[in-house]
């Protein structure tokens, strides 16, 4: 009998273990993932955060799929926008299913029995997420790309924006 239930602070250790496995898997499958998180340190950080926030912070939500053991989780937060549409969205941060239980409907159950009823109860009409280059699973499932994150190292950006002879944009401002 599979059950999807909200996680609570007592689940933080199991969540951290699964997140560590997800981070390690992602670094192998998507070596250019940004930002890079050490699987152990990243899992420890998020596990501690979940332990602190679950049950006390209504914007932090995690659902577990369990049978006799925990087989997967979906974690995310409600994001509000002071300006723009939609005014709020649920941002999915992590979805993970233990490898030996994949392709058995667990991920669908986490969305169907955990996230979607929550969104309906709270008037949330949009679910968002972020993925890494090369991870095409979301597009295959009908998710639309709405934004692309970009990054540049500070040292490289410093070279990009260095003053050059002929720059006149701020000559008067520096005097």
Outline where the language-model segments fall:
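Conserved GNAT-fold acetyl-CoA-binding loop/helix
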Residues: 24-50
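Conserved beta-strand in the GNAT
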Residues: 64, 69-78, 91, 96
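A short helix-loop-beta-strand connector motif used in the catalytic cores of GNAT acetyltransferases and
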Residues: 44-63
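Conserved GNAT acetyl-CoA-binding A-motif
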Residues: 119-131
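Conserved catalytic-core motifs of GNAT/GCN5-like acyltransferases
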Residues: 81, 128-132, 139, 144-159
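Conserved acetyl-CoA-binding loop-helix of GNAT-fold acetyltransferases
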Residues: 97, 103-117
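A conserved beta-turn-beta hairpin within the catalytic core of GNAT-like acetyltransferases
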Residues: 80-92, 102
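A short beta-loop-alpha structural element at the N-terminal edge
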Residues: 3-18, 23-29
């Amino acid at each position: 009998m599979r059950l999807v239930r909200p996680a609570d602070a007592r689940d933080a250790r199991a969540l951290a273990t699964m997140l560590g496995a997800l981070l390690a898997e992602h670094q192998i499958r998507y070596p250019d993932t940004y930002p890079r998180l050490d699987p152990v340190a990243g899992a420890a950080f998020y596990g501690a955060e979940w332990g602190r926030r679950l049950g006390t912070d209504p914007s932090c939500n995690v659902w577990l799929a369990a049978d006799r053991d925990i087989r997967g989780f979906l974690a995310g937060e409600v994001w509000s926008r002071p300006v723009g549409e939609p005014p709020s969205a649920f941002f999915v941060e992590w979805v993970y299913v233990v490898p030996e239980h994949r392709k058995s409907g667990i991920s669908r159950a986490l969305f169907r029995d955990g996230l979607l009823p929550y969104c309906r109860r709270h008037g949330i009409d949009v679910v968002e997420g972020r993925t890494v280059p090369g991870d095409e699973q979301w597009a295959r499932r009908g998710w639309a790309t709405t934004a692309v994150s970009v990054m540049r190292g500070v040292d490289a950006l410093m070279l990009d924006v260095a003053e050059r002879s002929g720059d006149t944009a701020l000559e008067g401002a520096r005097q």
